[in-house]
Structure formats: C-alpha cells, structure tokens
Regions:
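A general sequence property marking short-to-moderate contiguous segments
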Residues: 1-3
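Active-site-adjacent loop and "lid" segments of alpha/beta metabolic enzymes
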Residues: 5, 9, 15-16, 27, ...
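Catalytic domains of carbohydrate-active enzymes, especially glycoside hydrolases
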Residues: 63-79, 266
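Short loop/edge segments at beta-strand edges and connector loops
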Residues: 117
Length: 298
C-alpha cells in the first residue's frame, strides 16, 4: 500500500534529488517551468489500444487537439505507429503521409506539436515541417537526429526503452535495479545530446514501453514503483515527463479514470510533463494541487 510511511523514507533517502532544480524550457514562446503541464495524446494509428485517443483523419485530429487544449493541454503529442504488441510496423513514408498533414493543421491553429517516433528520418522531416518537439521512443545513436533538434531550436523528450525501440520485445530490468539502469542510460544519452546542440529536453522513464512487463497486479506495481521514484531523475537537471498508465487490470470498464489516479502519483513524484490521453480528467488534479496546500489563501 502507498502510504506516508512508504513515501517519506523514499523522499528522505533521495532528498537531494527531490530538491534539485531543473531547467526552465521555452518552446516556441511557451515557457515550461518547474511545475506540472499536460502533453495531450492523439494516436493517428488505428492499432492503438486506447480507442478514445484515435483520430482517423486530419479534421478529427484537429478537433481533438483543440478540445484537449481547451481542457488544459500545453502541447499535443501525435504518433503514427502504435507501440502495442500486435500493431503493424509503419515505415518512414507511411508515417510521414499520416503525420505531415496533421502537423500542418495543428501548427496553423497555433498549437505546440510533439511527434512521437523512433525513426531518424521521421523526426527530421517532422522538424522541417515545423514540429517543435520530438518524443524519441528509441535508442537512436545517429547524431543527425539530435543535430536536427538542435538546429531547429526544438525540444526533445528522451525516453528510456529497455530495447532498441519502444517496439522491442526484451526483458525489463528487475524493479530494484530499474532506476539505476535508467540513470545510466540517461547519463550516456545526455552526453551525446549535449554535443549536438540540444538544450531543451525532458527525461522520460518510459515505464509503459516494455512489451513483456508482467500482467495484472505485478504490472501495476512495477509501473507505479517506477513512477513514484521518477523524481530521482531531477538530479540530472532536466524536467521529467511521465506517461499516465491505464492500469486496465484494476479499472476495467472505468479505465478512462485511471489516469486521474496516476496523475496524483505523478505529482507526488514532482513530474513536470504528464503525457495523458484524458486531459479533462487529469487537469482538475493539477488545478487542485496548485490551489491547495500550506501557504495558499482560502
């Protein structure tokens, strides 16, 4: 059970990380400081398991993006390939055919656009089309990707993946060594990224990407443990992005409110960017914690 008796020793053991300052980022005029924001998700792949987030065409994507922005999203994350086990692999041309018209439409509406991909060619083309952030879901060694991010003065969400990409079916590290594995990954990647001129990024532990995580309660425990410890990445000096897990095992038909619960845990871990399919259900949690607490005037 998650209780103060569990959380307080964790926070005290890593007090330096908990209190560590992180950089303020500015993306195309929008400032992201050390407080929580939402990254609203639009899935352009029909293979996505989160059916409510799917947009089948440009008008649907634009409608969903506008709605999520009104509901509280600071930025919109779009992807053309699902990371699900049975989802089709989509090549560069296929992804760009789906992504580019949506990027154009969202930019024309004045929205901030993040593109989720693990392919260098897709990322570079998205940046050239005007996307302001790349949500990188793979262990890309090619400096061309990072140089393109730096050249366009764009942002980067640097995701940990146990394998080469979010689609890789590999064993995940044991829960008690997971943070150490992730920390090593990020330190190595940050050296590469910094040398390519990238100076706007979020750290994302990527705990939803492992295809062979255990099912049922063990999966939920694994993800929530990693989520609650994600504040430890603050010691790297960059803001932290986390995805709201759906916890289907627990929520069943009420899965659409799962992200509300996960948002509470994310805020306890001082997350800066909450990647959410359910912006309207998550934003009240952010607002409540913003207006409540010691020092707030009734």
């Amino acid at each position: 059970m998650i209780t103060p008796d569990v959380l307080l020793p964790l926070w005290e053991a890593h007090r330096a990380a908990l209190d560590h300052p992180v950089r303020t980022l500015e993306i195309d005029g929008r400032v992201f400081d050390d407080r929580p924001y939402q990254l609203g998700v639009i899935n352009l792949s029909r293979d996505s398991s989160y059916r409510e987030s799917i947009a089948h065409d440009v008008p649907a994507a634009l409608y969903r993006a506008r709605r999520m922005t009104i509901e509280g999203a600071a930025m919109i994350d779009i992807g053309a390939e699902s990371t699900g086990t049975n989802a089709d692999i989509v090549d560069v041309d296929g992804q760009l055919a789906t992504l580019l018209p949506v990027i154009d439409a969202l930019l024309a509406d004045g929205l901030l656009v993040s593109v989720e991909t693990y392919l260098t060619d897709v990322a570079v083309a998205a940046l050239e089309a005007g996307a302001q952030v790349i949500n990188l879901t793979g262990r890309v060694d090619d400096p061309a990707l990072y140089e393109a991010v730096g050249r366009h003065d764009a942002g980067l969400i640097l995701c940990y993946t146990p394998g080469e990409t979010a689609r890789s079916d590999v064993d995940v590290p044991p829960v008690d060594t997971m943070i150490d594995e992730q920390m090593t990954f990020f330190r190595d990647r940050l050296d590469l990224v910094a040398g390519c001129g990238v100076d706007k990024l979020w750290i994302d532990p990527g705990f939803g990407f492992a295809l062979n995580l255990p099912d049922g309660p063990d999966r939920v425990r694994y993800q929530t443990d990693n989520l609650l410890q994600s504040f430890r990445f603050r010691e790297l000096g960059w803001p932290v992005c986390v995805t709201m897990a759906s916890a289907v095992y627990l929520f069943h038909d009420e899965v659409r409110v799962a992200e509300t619960a996960m948002a509470v845990l994310a805020l306890l871990a001082k997350a800066n960017l909450l990647r959410s399919h359910e912006v309207a259900r998550v934003q009240p949690v952010l607002d409540m914690l913003e207006i409540c607490g010691p020092g707030q005037t009734p």
